[in-house]
Amino acid sequence: MTRTVKFEKLIQTDHKLVFREISNFETYVSYVPGCSKAVLVERTDAYEVGKLEFNLLFKNYSITSKNYISDNKIKIEQIDGPFISFEGEWRVIKKDKNITKIIFTANFELPSLLNKLLSENSIDIFFKNSLEGFVDKLSD
């Protein structure tokens, strides 16, 4: 079963700063719940490959993704990880001089056991807390 999440947030921060922070996934340890390590594996002109490690539900997980970075968008494709499939996207939209809209969407399919353990609500809370942690970090 494919699940979809989408979150949007307006923040009072310059869009270039917001995009720079989102594209630096090595800082995700600072605000993504359960993320214990974030490493840049490879960088080319076309994409970056990164690995995030998590400790969730008393188990260690890692996800390696290929991230295609453009002017205001980052497309994320899982290369290896706990999902059967995962595609995500960050979009950063300049609304005004220091008003930025952040949009995160993801489509993913979990393995049967994780799918049974994780309710829609718990998944929504995880992604919402990640986005809020990111916004709080930018507000500091």
Regions found by a protein language model. Give the residues of each.
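Short, ordered beta-strand-loop transition motifs
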Residues: 1, 40-47, 68-71, 95-97
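Hydrophobic ligand-binding cavity/cleft-lining segments
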Residues: 1-45
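Intrinsic-disorder/low-complexity, polar/charged segments enriched in Ser/Thr/Lys/Arg/Asp/Glu/Gln
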Residues: 2-10, 47-49, 62, 85-87, ...
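Generic structural detector for well-ordered beta-strands
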Residues: 8-12, 39, 68, 91, ...
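Hydrophobic-ligand binding "helix-grip"
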Residues: 55-99, 107
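A conserved amphipathic terminal alpha-helix motif
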Residues: 107-140
